[in-house]
């Protein structure tokens, strides 16, 4: 193996992969015993909260498409490189044996055609699994327009598949990527969803049925490139969760890197708070029982940057409050600002045996600086009397501190 040549390819293709936010760079130099190169190493988190290190690279940054927002676009004058199948396999196993990584995150520009590219991604995963007995995590990008046969094989070797929508609206995609259309991305999503269901049904009767994409599928939206409102983005995400059974939707604030009249100017920075608020709204849909239609409406198309989405929703719908915690159903307790999923379940358990008090809530981890205005308890709660007060918003602003409190907060460089 020509290590100097491989190192140069790794530098180019790891840098090209950094704009996919399905996992984040650790930025760790790893000095000392077992020192590793930081190029291509990123951290991601499993559903149970474990942090795993992944080799995150592109197979190639050559691409037949000329999407305005993409640094690998066909017309962009940048250094190009491409790994061979064996180079990616050897690189992955080399990092894995040294405990630098626990898995592989592999994407690619599209060269020649979709099947040609996807077939090589699958060959890498297959070779790792069958020839090298690689048991680590594998995340493959689904290439739009790839055949069903290749996608089926990909699902047998990858833990997760993802096809990035990038632009959440049809009009935005047509503006910035006229060579693509939404159905190119949704068709493979639908196929993977159906295969997941089919394999799960088969496993109920035939235990030897292999797993198909056990970690599910995901997608990513670029925020701020095409001028969509937060309402449009959230409703698009909600639709993908409902129709395609996605495990996650990721949101990436657009980082201006290319000069194009269709894009925001290079001096534009997407506020970090907007990206953060979208993740919080996504959390409400996934864990708190909110529908995408109710988080925002036509009168309120953007998320409130001063308050998290649940608190902002509560302020707009004060008729739902205060909530009597001693008797309210779990679904309503989950809508109280400052009460998380674990705390809500503890409240339901504890109230069967005793009267809930502020002291109990504090021990459960409830954020009382927000929750106290939206609840009633068996004991007196003078804060609940302020639910209809015009001053409530100001009081909450005084009591709420955010790490994004500076108005000029911008997105940090992923690899800076």
Model-predicted regions and their roles:
Residues 118-126, 130, 155-164, 224-243, ...:
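Short, electropositive alpha-helical surface patch
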Residues 303-332, 358-416:
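C-terminal extensions
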Residues 73-88, 96-121, 127-148, 155-204, ...:
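Core AdoMet radical
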Residues 169, 184-261, 270-296:
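Conserved C-terminal portion of the radical SAM core fold
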Residues 267-270, 284-323:
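Alpha-helical ds-nucleic-acid-binding substructure associated with the helix-hairpin-helix region
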Residues 61-73:
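Local cysteine-cluster metal-coordination motifs and their immediate loop/turn environment
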Residues 1-62, 367, 375-376, 383-405, ...:
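Flexible, acidic/Gly-rich N-terminal and inter-domain linker regions that tether
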């Amino acid at each position: 193996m020509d290590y100097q040549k491989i190192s140069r390819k790794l530098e180019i293709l790891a840098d090209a992969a950094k704009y996919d936010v399905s996992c984040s760079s650790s930025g760790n130099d790893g000095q000392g015993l077992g020192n590793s190169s930081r190029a291509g190493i990123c951290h991601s988190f499993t559903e149970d909260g474990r942090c795993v290190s992944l080799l995150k690279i592109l197979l190639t940054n050559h691409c037949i498409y000329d999407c305005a927002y993409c640094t690998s676009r066909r017309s962009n004058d940048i250094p190009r490189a491409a790994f061979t199948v064996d180079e990616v396999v050897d690189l992955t196993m080399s990092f894995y044996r040294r405990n630098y990584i626990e898995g592989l995150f592999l994407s690619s520009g599209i060269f020649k055609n979709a099947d040609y590219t996807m077939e090589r991604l699958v060959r890498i995963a297959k070779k790792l699994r069958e020839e090298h007995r690689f048991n680590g995590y594998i995340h493959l990008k689904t290439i739009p327009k790839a055949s069903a046969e290749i996608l089926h094989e990909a699902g047998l070797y990858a833990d997760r598949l993802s096809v990035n929508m990038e632009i959440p609206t049809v009009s935005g995609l047509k503006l910035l990527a006229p060579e693509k259309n939404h159905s190119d991305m949704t068709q493979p999503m639908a196929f993977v969803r159906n295969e997941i269901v089919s394999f799960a049904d088969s496993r109920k009767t035939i235990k030897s049925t292999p797993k198909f994409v056990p970690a599910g599928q995901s997608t990513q939206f670029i925020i701020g490139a095409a001028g969509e409102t937060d309402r449009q983005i959230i409703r698009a995400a909600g639709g993908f969760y409902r129709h395609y059974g996605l495990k996650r939707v990721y949101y990436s604030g657009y980082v201006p890197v290319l000069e194009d009249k269709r894009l925001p100017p290079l001096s534009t920075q997407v506020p970090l708070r907007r990206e953060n608020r979208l993740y919080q709204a996504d959390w409400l849909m996934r864990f708190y029982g909110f529908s995408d239609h109710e988080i925002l409406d036509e009168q309120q198309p953007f998320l409130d940057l001063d308050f998290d989405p649940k608190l902002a929703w509560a302020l707009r719908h004060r008729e739902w409050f205060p909530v009597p915690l001693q008797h309210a159903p779990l679904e309503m307790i989950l809508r109280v600002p400052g009460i998380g999923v674990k705390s809500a379940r503890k409240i339901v358990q504890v109230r069967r045996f005793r009267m809930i008090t502020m002291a109990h809530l504090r021990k459960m981890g409830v954020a009382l600086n927000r929750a106290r205005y939206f609840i009633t308890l068996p004991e007196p709660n003078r804060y609940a009397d302020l639910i209809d007060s015009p001053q409530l918003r100001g009081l909450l602003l005084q009591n709420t501190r955010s790490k994004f409190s500076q108005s000029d907060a911008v997105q940090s460089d992923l690899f800076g």
